[in-house]
Swiss-Prot record:
PANTHER family, alphabetized: ALCOHOL DEHYDROGENASE, ALCOHOL DEHYDROGENASE 1A
One Gene Ontology term of the molecular function aspect: all-trans-retinol dehydrogenase (NAD+) activity
Superkingdom field: Eukaryota
Classification via CDD domains: alcohol_DH_class_I_II_IV (cd08299)
Principal cellular location given in the protein's record: cytoplasm
Note accompanying the cofactor annotation: Binds 2 Zn(2+) ions per subunit.
Protein name as catalogued: Alcohol dehydrogenase 1
Subunit structure: Homodimer.
Amino acid sequence: MSTVGKVIKCKAAVLWEANKPFSLEEVEVAPPKAHEVRIKIVATGICRSDDHVVTGALAMPFPIILGHEAAGVIESVGEKVTSLKPGDAVIPLFVPQCGECRSCLSTKGNLCIKNDLSSSPTGLMADGTTRFTCKGKAIHHFVGTSTFTEYTVVHETAAAKIDSAAPLEKVCLIGCGFSTGYGAVLQTAKVEAGSTCAVFGLGGVGLSVVMGCKAAGASRIIAVDINKDKFAKAKELGATECINPKDFKKPIHEVLTEMTGQGVDYSFEVIGRIETMTAALASCHNNYGVSVIVGVPPAAQKISFDPMLIFSGRTWKGSVFGGWKSKDAVPKLVADYMKKKFVLDPLITHTLPFTKINEGFDLLRTGKSIRSVLVL
């Protein structure tokens, strides 16, 4: 029986309020409106950014369906959709690509103005309404994607068509974690061969930064984490050295400066803590070092630092979705994965049924997982 043009009832993980477990509910998913597509989600990763909403570190409206790193198949399309059709394999994009705003038109930009992750997220579609209801209540969208559900609706500019032969339970990581880390190196920092790099934080995104540094030909890749259990994987993926800040009496930026002579060429903060952001900045060369903020900064916290850190010549950059123009880059990244130009399997430590979403988040919070993928 065709579902086209009809409301679909399906299972979703609803977060009714902060600091509570996800609740598996039956939700109604409305048909896509003009320029929108409805996607049957096949696999979705659990990312630290989702947990930031649970803890309140990332402010979002409630109730909400989280999830933003996924892959699925187009179930139906709304009017005026031209780039996608039912049956297409797709990856939803939390950074859309409208192709018309200044960021999209600039060779230097990728943060499309149509995103819903900037300073005041609405949790709604472009027309100011939601496509999800549960128990008679409107449920908010998350960064234009909402993938912790069997079906979701996204704007046409927020989905990239990919190779239908790609394993969706692997390439879903290209929807966030892998691309964010890998691109921070290749697109944002533009690390050169022979460079020295430091990577703060060895979760899924941090390990993807390590992979990017190796791909760029960095000669030293120093991985920094307080969980030494992550060091073996970091070395497997390209880290040349691994250090634990807890093993030293002096600040970690001093340790790195001593290890490298005058500091690293490039540092990457992939945790989302203001203390490590300033430490990463201080760790890079005082005159030409580049430090990139990759971890999502905590809401309502301000950063203070010695301006001499910048005055001497350092560059401090941010990177959203690895600097990739999403709709253009994601199909190419999937193609590169299919050509074995990089691996994703080492990042996926757990594959769980969707019903075990709360267990997946527990694995993340206790540091026992790198990436858990939920299969719907």
